[in-house]
Amino acid sequence: ICAKCNSKVRDIDISIHFNSADHQRILDGKTMGSEVWVRDTTGVKGDLSKRICNQLSKIGFRNRGVKTTSGLWVLNKTSKPALLIEVCFVSDPDDAKLYKANKDNVAKAIVQAILNYNKKH
């Protein structure tokens, strides 16, 4: 994935994923919602990540916020700023149901966050 990203002309890399939790945490009422992972929150990464979380929360996903890590390959090995969006926890029945009912709205929310970021900058 990183090699493919690095071979293209772009400003940012956005990877869309779905989260999952172990069986002990599936129904705990806490392990649900959207989050965006970045290596750090400088520049476009922090602002756009917050916007994406906020837009997804308007659909009804719990806003788990922006999280940082140095341990994800896709965030470390791309030559442009990178975001990894975890749309929801597919292991949580409520999250999975919300996603299935709002697939198009999820895509629109991510696009709207990008458009809002571009208007501001």
Predicted regions and their residues:
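Catalytic-core regions of hydrolytic enzymes
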Residues: I1-S34, V38-D47
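Extracytoplasmic/secreted envelope proteins and their assembly/folding machinery
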Residues: C2, G46-C53, A107, V111
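Active-site-adjacent mobile loop/cap segments within catalytic or ligand-binding domains
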Residues: K8, S15-F18, D22, G65-H121
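Short, low-complexity, polar/charged sequence segments that are solvent-exposed and flexible
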Residues: W37-R39, Q55-K58, N102-V106
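Active-site-adjacent substrate-binding region
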Residues: V44-K67
